[in-house]
């Protein structure tokens, strides 16, 4: 799998949480819909070159059951992830791939597991309640540290969130949410 496809898969994984089986339709999904633009950069490591990709996204549902569409700037969907208790399904032009859970998906795509469940809360500007967090105090930019990541909320009033993990390979996730 080339690095763009792997990173597209990573983007799908980044915004999902829980274990999954594809829901039958978007109408079955509860929770809030988030949409906007997402950019992910994984710095180079001894095993792999630096990778980056950006996409428009629409996230429906919640950490337990939902769907994520990733689109080109012209609106063509190039990856879709669906999840519900039991299985994760990633659909790309290269085919469908099932995973037992999102940790398995992120390990397959990036070679390591990422804190997917936390990202639902991080995109809403708050720490995930499932793990301890530490607020970042002034004069630093507002935000918090959680699970080895620094979540920067300096531009949250502009609907922007940046999460960065410094541990190698460092990973940066930038999201610009559409306003309702």
Positions of PLM-derived features:
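Sec-dependent bacterial lipoprotein signal peptides
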Residues: 1-19
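Mature, soluble, non-transmembrane domains
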Residues: 20-23, 92, 99-101, 107-180
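Post-signal-peptide N-terminal segment of Sec-exported extracytoplasmic proteins
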Residues: 34-74, 78
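Charge-rich amphipathic alpha-helical interaction elements
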Residues: 35-46, 87, 93, 171, ...
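Short, surface-exposed charged micro-motifs
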Residues: 56-58, 78-80, 150-153, 174
């Amino acid at each position: 799998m080339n690095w763009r496809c792997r990173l597209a898969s990573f983007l799908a994984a980044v915004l999902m949480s829980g274990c999954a089986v594809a829901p039958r339709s978007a109408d079955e999904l509860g929770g809030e819909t988030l949409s906007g633009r997402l950019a992910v950069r994984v710095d180079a490591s001894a095993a792999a070159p630096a990778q980056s990709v950006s996409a428009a996204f629409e996230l429906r549902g919640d950490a337990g059951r939902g769907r994520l569409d990733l689109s080109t700037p012209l609106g063509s969907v190039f990856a879709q992830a669906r999840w519900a208790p039991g299985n994760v399904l990633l659909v790309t032009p290269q085919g469908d791939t099932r995973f037992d859970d999102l940790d398995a998906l992120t390990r397959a795509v990036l070679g390591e597991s990422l804190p997917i469940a936390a990202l639902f809360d991080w995109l809403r500007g708050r720490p995930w309640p499932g793990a301890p967090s530490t607020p970042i105090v002034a004069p630093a930019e507002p935000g918090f540290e959680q699970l080895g990541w620094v979540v920067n909320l300096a531009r949250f009033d502009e609907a922007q969130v940046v999460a960065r993990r410094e541990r190698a390979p460092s990973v940066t996730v930038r999201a610009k949410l559409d306003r309702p």
